[in-house]
């Protein structure tokens, strides 16, 4: 089993978490577009740097050299998020960045060998999110119901809290990845292009989306025994997928201004949330038995609980945080 010790990451993640309450940075850099501040642009930037020491699996090769232990430093995430509140009802969101650049991998497509486009160099900058959103029913303190709708490349992909997690405030070192079951198959880095609706009714929060999955064309291995058939992603002209997440917030209410779910509030909120979500895509995988191709639907379900309870002196920002999730992947 590969064992990895991330020496500096935990410290860096802690710094990122605490920075959310910084009086200098706050929720990013805000530029008002009118004197009242109701029209504005906001920018949020974050970098996550990993220094690692890893005990490698037997037979591991790096650069044609067999190794048993490896130390390296890499760029886990470099991101820039910008959104423009054009009016109280209309917002434009753009999120760009890179992921996982090291000395040996993460470079742009076609990079390799040595030189200007050698191994790991010049990673491909791409859009993580790009959508427009309109508030049909504006959220107000005195009104229990709100509704916003939007379209574009988005992160409202349902399933679970961890499936829509922010990368700014994990309590753990990173996400376990299986919370994104289709990552880089029928989605673009856990996103799809589609239409979404989000909102609240008192303490109940809902998110729904209708999306066009990215095309996949993996070829299944043909077998003679149906029990041995293994489905692969192959949707060709993909049919529309549907996703949703529903959550009840028993204590403090969370913001749903953006889709990114917080990992820990470090004592600034008292949270106890119970949620459930789904993702379904018809005719999205195929198997081959005796030369006969059969299509299958993807049906995913999750139920989760999130607890984040302040403890001790509020000024020290301490909390007991817990998260548990059940996934059913078919």
Put a short name on every predicted segment.
Residues 54-60, 286-289:
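Short, glycine/acidic-enriched capping/hinge loops at junctions between secondary-structure elements
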Residues 29-56, 67-216, 238-254:
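Outer membrane beta-barrel
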Residues 1-4:
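Positively charged n-region of N-terminal signal peptides that target proteins for export
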